[in-house]
Regions:
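Short, well-formed alpha-helical segments that are part of the catalytic scaffolds
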Residues: 80-89, 99, 103-119
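Short aromatic/hydrophobic "clamp" motif used to bind/position activated sugar donors
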Residues: 150
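Donor nucleotide-sugar recognition loop
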Residues: 229-230, 239, 243-264, 271-282
Length: 347
């Protein structure tokens, strides 16, 4: 594969350049979008909020407006315009899902989702019940797996979109390593340290009543390309990627920072890394940043001194909206439609 040559050349990623924040333009666009929403013009309003967000990516109120418009449209049964992807290439081969879990209930719930969305696929679930660390467990799982397409994921996730398998294969045809949350600028101790406009996630949070808190971070969609760091809740790539860039089980012998390490090394090696936002999962956990995490964060910085943060972590501010789980996929379809469109002039 092409990336095998790139592995011989390690490069330090640079910070991507974005247009400067234009608060004046963002405010004009935001107020126009609010007026359109009040008039019930949800499609135009959502598009306007998207433009406002691109002008000022650090303002989550525009993301909130997009979510509100998308929910109104989804509840009305109005479907977002579809992109014809029939000719897009798909990665071929068996799919191996590798999960470390000591919770039978979580594992059974995840397997139920996988059975549903992969029912027409050639796939397998590799369960590691006694992992000493995620690196050790995932490495052992990879040795057991038969698939060409490898997925490492947590056991406390669920899958929202029914065409998950097709989306996964499309993304793996275009990229070497993908996740569902991440950043195109690696700095600090976590994937979201840099903040907007670099960070992106559409991961939702489930509620006890079955609804989802739909998250929206980053004015990108439905893909953030050239990612430098990915969150480990869900990582996928071809088998050769993980064989060429193995998990560092010696340094990260616990359950933190293994994901930052692996994805950052993949980026440094020149692999095509991306955040595939439209894979649409929910995650039960909001993350654990206690003493154990800090210990491994220190190891990460010791291994890669260039990641030493020059500023405090950016606030993790995301648009969030409670929606019925059945409406999450059509809601995010509108988000993808608006964020994929180009900017237009202000009337």
């Amino acid at each position: 594969m092409a990336f095998e040559q790139d592995l011989k050349q390690v490069r330090l990623p640079s910070r991507p350049q974005y247009p400067p924040v234009n608060q004046t333009r963002a405010e004009l666009l935001f107020q126009k979008a609010v007026a359109q929403a009040r008039a019930g013009h949800w499609q135009d309003s959502g598009s306007g909020f998207a433009e406002a967000w691109r002008s000022a990516p650090d303002q989550p109120r525009s993301a909130q407006g997009m979510l509100e418009c998308a929910l109104h449209l989804a509840r009305s049964g109005i479907v977002a315009p579809a992109i014809d992807l029939r000719s897009a290439p798909r990665a071929m081969g068996r799919i191996s899902i590798i999960v470390c879990s000591i919770d039978p209930r979580r594992l059974a719930r995840l397997k139920s989702d996988l059975d549903r969305v992969l029912r027409q696929e050639d796939w397998e679930l590799i369960h590691i019940a006694d992992a000493r660390s995620l690196c050790e467990g995932y490495t052992r799982g990879l040795l057991r797996a038969d698939g060409e397409l490898i997925v490492f994921c947590h056991d406390d996730i669920g899958i929202v979109c029914e065409d998950f398998a097709d989306r996964l294969r499309r993304h793996l045809a275009a990229h070497d390593l993908i996740g569902v949350a991440g950043s195109d600028y690696a700095t600090g101790h976590s994937w979201h340290w840099a903040g907007p406009p670099h960070t992106a996630s559409w991961v939702s949070l489930p509620r006890p009543d079955g609804a989802l808190v739909c998250g929206l971070l980053g004015a990108h969609g439905p893909v953030l390309r050239d990612a430098q760091v990915l969150d480990g809740v869900f990582l996928a790539g071809r088998r050769a990627v993980f064989e060429q860039i193995p998990f560092d089980a010696d340094t990260f012998d616990g359950f933190h920072c293994y994901d930052f390490d692996l994805s950052y090394r993949a980026c440094r090696a020149g692999l095509r890394c991306a955040v595939a936002l439209d894979l649409l999962i929910w995650h039960q956990s909001g993350g654990d940043f206690g003493e154990s995490w800090r210990r491994y964060a220190d190891r990460l910085i010791a291994k890669f001194p260039e990641l030493t943060p020059r500023a405090p972590s950016a606030p993790y501010r995301t648009g969030a909206l409670v929606a019925e789980s059945a409406l999450a996929a059509p809601l995010y379809a509108w988000i993808a439609h608006w964020l994929s469109a180009g900017p237009s002039a202000i009337d």
